[in-house]
């Protein structure tokens, strides 16, 4: 039955209603979030403290860690509170805020991934010009531009989604405030909103994916010209790890946002969103950083200094 009263709060259905699964899921999500927190904030601190990591590649990695922490924190704590207390309500303004920051950080990540791919292209394909290509100003502009695009995109999508009238129901068939489940609750004409999402997300993803694919195409060509089989295998292994994370990120994003609203199945979307919003931020420090010898060396030095400081105190 249609309700003509505008909603002031939403009810997030969550992942499951089974009471026996709430505590186990809370523990799992808490574990994932703690790894995300320690991994990403630890990576930022490590890069700041070690002068050997003050290079363009690690500058982008530190920003990637920041946005991973940002969009995970926009979603995961509220989900965990729901598991622990059973509180599924979220105020209208809180829902809009959660949606805004999630979109802002997820978009910034998309452009940062493209910047990282370009940085690797410059390092591997144009090594003699690398220092003049990836200057401090260029790196800063790429990072700042990623955040500007992120918050601009978030403003567009938040305004586009929350300008609609939600008078049919306030029950969101999802575990956080996202565009597809919110659009299904609207009693306004959703066509324009769906087209805005499709074209804006499509443009952002297409631009970033093209930069990544073209960069890696030249990288692979350069790798194939390497004479050392060991060096070639190592470079291929590194690129494969990066491309795996990129494929998961863009694959789930395209699956979520570049389909008509009528083809969304909330159960499937929830599972995709778990990977997109919660698991990927946990994996990125491992895929992009902890496999790196320079990061491992910096970590060992930091731990050694910490042990020495503790020994000196006691």
Swiss-Prot record:
According to the record, which residues are glycosylated? 3, 261
Q: Which residue ranges are assigned to the Cytoplasmic compartment in the record's topology?
A: 45-52, 119-137, 216-235, 291-314
Q: Which InterPro entries match?
A: GPCR_Rhodpsn, GPCR_Rhodpsn_7TM, Olfact_rcpt
List where the protein spans the membrane: 24-44, 53-73, 98-118, 138-158, 195-215, 236-256, 270-290
Does the keyword section mention NADP? no
**Gene Ontology CC entries for this record:** plasma membrane
Q: Does the keyword Membrane apply?
A: yes
Which stretches of this protein does UniProt put in the Extracellular compartment?
Answer: 1-23, 74-97, 159-194, 257-269
Q: Name one GO molecular function term.
A: odorant binding
Pfam families, A to Z: 7tm_4 (PF13853)
Sum up the protein's function in the record's words.
Odorant receptor.
Protein family per UniProt: Belongs to the G-protein coupled receptor 1 family.
What this protein is called in its record is Olfactory receptor 5B12
Q: Which organism is it from?
A: Homo sapiens (Human)
The lineage, from the top, is: Eukaryota, Metazoa, Chordata, Craniata, Vertebrata
């Amino acid at each position: 039955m249609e309700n003509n009263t505008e909603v002031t709060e939403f009810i997030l259905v969550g992942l499951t209603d089974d009471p026996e699964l709430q505590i186990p899921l809370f523990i799992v999500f808490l574990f994932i979030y703690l790894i995300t927190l320690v991994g990403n904030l630890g990576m930022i601190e490590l890069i700041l403290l070690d002068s050997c990591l003050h290079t363009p590649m690690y500058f982008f990695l530190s920003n990637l860690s920041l946005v991973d922490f940002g969009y995970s924190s926009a979603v995961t704590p509220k989900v965990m509170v729901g598991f622990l207390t059973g509180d599924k309500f979220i105020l209208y303004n809180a829902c809009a805020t959660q949606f805004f920051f999630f979109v802002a950080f997820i978009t910034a990540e998309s452009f940062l991934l493209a910047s990282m791919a370009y940085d690797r292209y410059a390092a591997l394909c144009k090594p003699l010009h690398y220092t003049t290509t990836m200057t401090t100003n260029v790196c800063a502009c790429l990072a700042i531009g990623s955040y500007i695009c992120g918050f601009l995109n978030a403003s567009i999508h938040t305004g586009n989604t929350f300008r609609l009238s939600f008078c049919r129901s306030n029950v969101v068939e999802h575990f956080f405030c996202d565009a597809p489940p919110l659009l299904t609750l609207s009693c306004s004409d959703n066509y324009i909103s769906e087209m805005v999402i499709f074209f804006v997300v499509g443009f952002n993803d297409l631009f970033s994916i093209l930069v990544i694919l073209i960069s890696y195409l030249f990288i692979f060509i350069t790798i194939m010209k390497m004479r050392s089989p060991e060096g070639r295998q190592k470079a291929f292994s590194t690129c494969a790890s990066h491309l795996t994370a990129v494929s998961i990120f863009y694959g789930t994003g395209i699956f979520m946002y570049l389909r008509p609203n009528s083809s969304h199945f909330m159960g499937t979307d929830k599972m995709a969103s778990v990977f997109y919003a919660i698991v990927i931020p946990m994996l990125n420090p491992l895929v992009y950083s902890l496999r790196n010898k320079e990061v491992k060396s910096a970590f060992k030095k930091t731990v050694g200094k910490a042990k020495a400081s503790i020994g000196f105190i006691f």
